[in-house]
Structure formats: structure tokens, C-alpha cells
Amino acid sequence: MGDKRQRARVQGAWATPTKSQSAARPATPARSRPSQTPGPSWRSKEQQQCDRRFVFKEPQLVVRAAPEPRVIDREGVYEISLSPTGVSRVCLYPGFVDLKEADWILERLCQDVPWKQRMGIREDITYPQPRLTAWYGELPYTYSRVTMEPNPHWLPVLWTLKSRIEENTGHTFNSLLCNFYRDEKDSVDWHSDDEPSLGSCPVIASLSFGATRTFEMRKKPPPEENGDYTYVERVKIPLDHGTLLIMEGATQADWQHRVPKEYHSRERRVNLTFRTVYPDPRGAPGDTSAELPLR
């Protein structure tokens, strides 16, 4: 009897549940089961990923501005640059010749100097230079493929001016290039007085008479600029009646200068540029200039 009950219990364990048992524990459909909700820390990570935005930005270009020109209009000695070539220096002396004497000298120069309009050569093209010139010196002088023949016949007024400049500056000169700017249309283009016959670091004394014209300078660009003068240093110097300007040191090696055309009417102007020419450039001395005040 006991064995029958035990077998019935074992068989009942594998039997299909009764209706009452099925109703007591209804099966839960899979779709109605609650889903797992992420915790606060994981939700914040998802939010950070959703907030990320990748915005493309155009590459920014480096803007280079050309420097403002430096204006020199007062008496003094100015070091305008320092390079491996040396110090570039200009000395400005307004009123070196007083107005009354300067008026008389201007008249003498306009009348007595043998002015001539010479032909220049640029890129194998010949053109009339936009100014009149004259040369004084024992030796010829060649610049911009134009040769000035020797002319030892100095006018007394020119010799007197040369001696006065030498006495007051301590420099000596043996030659003179004269330029006559007839009006605002006459000019001289960018150049350096760096001909081999002038030696290294030549000293140029420029004495002006007549209408005021602006003397402009620009520094020669470094090799990496490939000859582009856009961003170089610049200097402007107004040269008045009777003003003396000295350029010395490495100025001709490191800088260019010009007298540009003017947009407004200008009267006549004569510029005398004293210099030293050597028969053999190999024997020319180097830079011996110093900051010599006007005596």
C-alpha cells in the first residue's frame, strides 16, 4: 500500500498541472515583462555622447600688415637698422645752408651747371631719365648702365659746398652727382648707391636746394621673401631748402631710396650728392664711419 502511494507521488510530479494550479500561477507573456532601466551614471554617459557635435572650421590665415613708414624730420643721427652687414645710419641737418644763401646758390646752380637729360637703360629698353643730371670728378662714374665721363672743372660754388661739408662732418669726397628736378613730374626710381667703384659702406652726402621733396627709403627684404618689398621697413624724410642728409654705414647695402613723382605742383629742386669714387674698388676702404656730430 505504501509503495503505491509513493509511485503516485512520483508520477504526479511529472503530471500536467491541474486547472486550479494553472489559474493560481498564470504565465507572464515575454512582451509584458518589465525592461531594465539604466541607472543615473550610465544615462549621463549616453547624454554626453548625444551632445557631441563636430563642427568644421575653415583654417585661419595669418594676416600680415605692412609697417607704417617711419618719418624723420628733425635734426639728429638715426640708426635705422642693424644687420650682419653692419649699422645703417642717416644724419639729418635741416638749415645746413641758411635761406638767403640757399636762394642765391639755387640760382647759380640752375644757370651755371651743364645740365643734360641722359638716356637710361632698363631691361634692355632705353628711356629718357625723368630729371637732368651733371657729373663732377676726376674719374668716370657708371650707374644703371649709364656712364658719366670725367669732369674735373668744378664750379667755385660747388667746391665751396664740398669743403664746408667735409669740414663739418669729417668725411671727404672727390666726386659729385647733381640732379635737377624741374617739377613734380621729375623723379628717381628705387636704387642703391652700391656701385663697386664706391667701395664697401660708402658715405653719401646729399644737399638739397629748392622745393621740398620726400626722400623715401625701404629696407631690402630677406631671402625668404623672394624679392617682395610689401612688408619691409620704410622711412620717409622731407628734404627742405638747404637741408643736408648723410647716409653712411651699411645703408647702401641694406636699403634702397628714391624721390617719387608728386601729385601736387612742385617748383624746381636741385640735389647735390657728394661721394668718393675709387679707381680700383679692391683698394677701397671698408666702413670707417662713426656717429660724427655736426661741428
Swiss-Prot record:
The keyword Transmembrane is assigned to this record: no
Reactions listed under catalytic activity: an N(1)-methyladenosine in mRNA + 2-oxoglutarate + O2 = an adenosine in mRNA + formaldehyde + succinate + CO2; a methylated nucleobase within DNA + 2-oxoglutarate + O2 = a nucleobase within DNA + formaldehyde + succinate + CO2; an N(1)-methyl-2'-deoxyadenosine in single-stranded DNA + 2-oxoglutarate + O2 = a 2'-deoxyadenosine in single-stranded DNA + formaldehyde + succinate + CO2 + H(+); an N(3)-methyl-2'-deoxycytidine in single-stranded DNA + 2-oxoglutarate + O2 = a 2'-deoxycytidine in single-stranded DNA + formaldehyde + succinate + CO2 + H(+)
Region (Disordered): 1-48
Post-translational modification: Ubiquitinated; undergoes 'Lys-48'-linked polyubiquitination. OTUD4 promotes USP7 and USP9X-dependent deubiquitination of 'Lys-48'-polyubiquitinated ALKBH3 promoting the repair of alkylated DNA lesions.
PTM annotation ((4R)-5-hydroxyleucine): residues: 177
Keyword Iron carried by entry: yes
Skewed-composition ranges (Low complexity): 22-35
Record EC number: 1.14.11.33, 1.14.11.54
Activity: how regulated: Activated by ascorbate.
InterPro entries reported in the protein's UniProt record: AlkB-like, AlkB-like_sf, ALKBH3, Oxoglu/Fe-dep_dioxygenase_dom
Pfam families to which the protein is assigned, alphabetical: 2OG-FeII_Oxy_2
A GO term from the CC aspect: cytosol
Homology family: Belongs to the alkB family.
Protein name: Alpha-ketoglutarate-dependent dioxygenase alkB homolog 3
